């Protein structure tokens, strides 16, 4: 295989500023996601003083806050953390779909990386598994994705 120039992001959060959006709905799950993201960024050299936690009611409100945060120029990355758990009505589908589309749109339009840490699960047990038990911690994964993307974009 021929040699290709490869651009990769380093996992160094030193000097970067992060906005962490976290929903209050299902906060017993979301707080674990936040803890995972903050711990990860700190282990990568980031400072808690460079992280701002924004609490919102639920997932539907995340895109508008992410848009304002990205446009502010104060943050290198936005990490969106929440948990939408399926109920007996189609409400889950509307909220999950619109929040997902909205967060992706913010990243594309602003050029600021947005980490997607919005759990969309069928059960509470699945959400707990993805917030720090056997399914890993999706807050860590969202923070890692944002950090790596920031560092890659710096090289493009």
UniProtKB/Swiss-Prot annotation:
GO molecular function: 6,7-dimethyl-8-ribityllumazine synthase activity
CDD domains in UniProt: Lumazine_synthase-I
Pathway of action: Cofactor biosynthesis; riboflavin biosynthesis; riboflavin from 2-hydroxy-3-oxobutyl phosphate and 5-amino-6-(D-ribitylamino)uracil: step 1/2
Binding site for 5-amino-6-(D-ribitylamino)uracil: 25, 59-61, 83-85, 116
Gene Ontology terms: biological process: riboflavin biosynthetic process
Keywords: Riboflavin biosynthesis, Transferase
Active-site residue numbers: 91 (proton donor)
Assigned protein family: Belongs to the DMRL synthase family.
UniProt-recorded name of the protein: 6,7-dimethyl-8-ribityllumazine synthase
Source organism (scientific name): Oleidesulfovibrio alaskensis (strain ATCC BAA-1058 / DSM 17464 / G20)
């Amino acid at each position: 295989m021929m040699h290709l120039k490869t651009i990769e992001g380093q996992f160094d959060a030193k000097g970067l500023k992060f906005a962490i959006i976290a929903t209050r709905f299902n906060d017993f799950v979301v707080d674990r996601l936040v803890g995972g993201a903050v711990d990860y960024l700190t282990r990568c050299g980031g400072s808690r003083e460079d992280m701002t936690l924004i609490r919102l009611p639920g997932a539907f409100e995340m895109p508008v806050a992410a848009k304002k945060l990205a446009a502010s120029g104060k943050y290198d990355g936005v990490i969106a953390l929440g948990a939408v758990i399926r109920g007996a009505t189609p409400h889950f589908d509307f909220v999950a779909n619109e929040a997902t589309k909205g967060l992706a749109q913010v990243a594309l339009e602003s050029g600021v990386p947005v980490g997607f840490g919005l759990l969309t699960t069928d059960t509470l047990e699945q959400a707990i598994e993805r917030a720090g038990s056997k399914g890993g911690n999706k807050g860590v994964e969202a923070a890692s994705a944002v950090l790596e993307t920031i560092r890659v974009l710096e090289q493009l």
